[in-house]
């Protein structure tokens, strides 16, 4: 089997995440304790707690998912895969797990990313919506026809594309999508237009941090969100990562390309099962499993 490891993004967090791993592995404890030091607050107390609400703050959610995913990948005795990818935030987990960045450096970037995105949401409010069961071409055409800024932001699977942009434009697009035959147009509970040009202030802040971060060639190709293509050159990886916050996540094409390049086993590492579901819709014949504790 040709193995692909995939890493989830924001929204997959759950109360108690990582607690069992922390208790059973000295290596995991060391990394998680180090994460608390880097972040300057005991994030593990929030991760291991019982409150889903406490996990929802972006400054907590993104580092928590990253820590859980990467510590699992590094401390579970896994063999090096043929390839890796991550959805949005998960791309940082994939890069750290594959050795393109150190755990510490990647966590610092995730913390900057979370803070910058939170600030951007407050300064440049926007919204997002999931469009269910409408051809991708139609979604792109409808977005282009709207009066404000709205674009496809996450190509999650053939039947699910998330749009992002100015609130009024997203609302207009949702109405037009339903008229065009969408099964549903579901507003998402977010206060920002992630993966759209409205995230430019956050992108600029993150770019400064990325520029100062050392990257090296990963142990295997990393399929990146912006291109859906494999990368091993540190300069290429860095350039694509710089574009990620304001560009669509091409997840459908990423999985299709991984399968075309030989992947027939996908292991989702981290909280939740969202990516297993998406992979199942994109490539029904591959084996899918999850590692979440």
Model feature map: region roles:
Residues 236, 240, 250-253, 274:
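Short amphipathic alpha-helical segments
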Residues 61-63, 193, 248:
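Glycine-rich phosphate/pyrophosphate-binding beta-alpha loops
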Residues 1-139, 184, 188, 265-293:
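FabD-like malonyl-/acyl-CoA
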Residues 77, 178, 259-262:
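Non-catalytic positions within long, well-ordered alpha-helices that form the structural scaffold/packing
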Residues 169-170, 209, 248, 262, ...:
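NAD(P)-dependent dehydrogenase/reductase Rossmann-like domain
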Residues 10-12, 39, 98-246:
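Alpha/beta catalytic cores of group-transfer enzymes, especially the acyltransferase/condensing modules
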Residues 247-263:
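A short, acidic, amphipathic alpha-helical segment used as a generic capping/interface helix at domain edges
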